[in-house]
Amino acid sequence: MGVGRFVYTPILPLMHAQAGLSAGAGADLATANYVGYLIGALAGTFVPRLVGSSIVLRSSLLALVASLAGMALTQSTAVWLLLRLGAGAFSAMIFVIAVSALLSHLREHPAHLPGWAFGGVGAGIALSGLLVLVLRTVGTWRSAWWASAVLAVLLTSAAWGLRPEPAVRRAPTASGAEPRSSGARNHRWFSALFASYTLEGIGYIIAGTFLVAAINQTLPGSIGSGAWVLVGLAAIPSSAFWAGLGRRWSRPDLLLAALGVQAVGIALPALAGGVAAALISAVLFGATFIGVSTLALGAGAHLRFPRAVALLTAGYSVGQILGPLVASPLLRHGYHQALLLSAGVVLAAALAAFLLRIGFPHAAPEGTERAGGDHRTAPGVVLPTGSGSPPSPGCSAEA
C-alpha cells in the first residue's frame, strides 16, 4: 500500500521532465488517486464482507501491481487518471483488510506492536523512494514505474498468506439504536476535532504530493528523491512513537504539537531552501503525518461520539481530494507557494486542535457506549495505530 499509493510522489518530477506531464495534470492524477482511495475505503466500511475475504485481498494486491505496471505502457493522461483511480481504490481495500487482520491476529500482543506494523506504510514509501533515487540516473519515468511494479510483486508475495478476520455482524444496542454521545459539549469537542482532521487531510496531502517536486525546483533531483526516502524512514516508527507519548500526555496536546511540527516541516523548503532544510523537512513531515492520524482517531474514539472514526476518516479523505485541487492554481508559479499554502492549512488544523484542548474530557464521556466497531474499517493514511485508545488494543488511533 505504501508503494502503490505514494510512489507517484518521487516519480512525478521525472514525468514532468520526460513525459511532458503538466503541473495541473499532475495534480489531477493525484486527485484521482485520492478519490479512488475514498471509494475503496467506503466499500470496505459499508460492505463488511469484503474485509473478511482473502480473495478480495489477493485480487486487490494483483490489481494494484497491474495499475503500477500500466502507468509505463501509455502516455495518455485519461488512462493514467483511471489507473491512479484504481490504485487508490485497491490501496484502500488492502489497508482496510490489513487493519482487520491485524486486530484479529495481534489482539493478545503488546499494544505497541500494531503501531510498528503500520510502519510498513513508511517502509513502502522509503523503498519506493530509494528505487526512484537509483533509477533517476540510469533509467526513465517508464523504468521507474516498471521497477515499482516489480517491488510491489515482491511485497505481494510476502503478504499473500495474510488471513483477514471474517466479517462479524455487530450486535445492536438494547434499543436498536446507535450509541449516543453525552450532549452538546461532546458535539463541540468532536466538531473541533473533525475540523482539525479534515484540514490536516487538505494540508498534509499537498505536501505529500508535491514535496519532492518542490525540493527539486532549487536542488539536484537526487536531494528530492533522498528526502522522500527520509520521509518513509521517519514514518516507520512514528505511530509507535506518538502512541507511547499518548500514555503520558493528552491526545489534544500531542495533536497540537504534532500539527505545529508538521507545519514547520512543510514550510521549510519554501522559506529556507538548501539541503539541510529539505532533509529536516522530510524528517519532520514523515514523523508526524501518521502520528496525527493516530492521535486524531484515538481522540475521536475516546469521545465515544457515534461513528466517530468513520466520520473522521470521511472528512480526512475528502480533504485529501480537495488538497491538490486547491493547490493547482498556484502550481504555475512553481511548488513553493503550494507548500506555504499546505503549511498554512496545517496551522489552521493546529488552531482547531487548540480549541479541542479547552475542557477536553480526559475521562471517557459518561452515558455513552463504547465507540468500537468503527476502527476496524477506518481507512485513513489514515492509519489506525497503537495509541491505547478505548476501542481496541493499540489500533483505533493512527498518519
Give the residues covered by each predicted segment.
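Extracytoplasmic gate region of multi-pass secondary transporters
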Residues: 9, 188-229, 236-237
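Helix-breaking motifs and short loop linkers at transmembrane-helix boundaries and internal kinks
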Residues: 20, 52, 73-78, 107, ...
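Conserved MFS/SLC helix-loop-helix module at the cytosolic interface between two early adjacent transmembrane helices
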Residues: 39-75
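Helix-to-loop junctions at the C-terminal end of transmembrane segments
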Residues: 40-53, 238-251, 331
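Helix-loop-helix hairpin linking two adjacent transmembrane segments in secondary transporters
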Residues: 77, 109, 115-164
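Cytoplasmic helix-loop-helix junction between adjacent transmembrane helices
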Residues: 83-121
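C-terminal transmembrane helical hairpin of 12-TM major facilitator-type secondary transporters
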Residues: 250-296
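A late C-terminal transmembrane helix in Major Facilitator Superfamily
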Residues: 303-335, 342
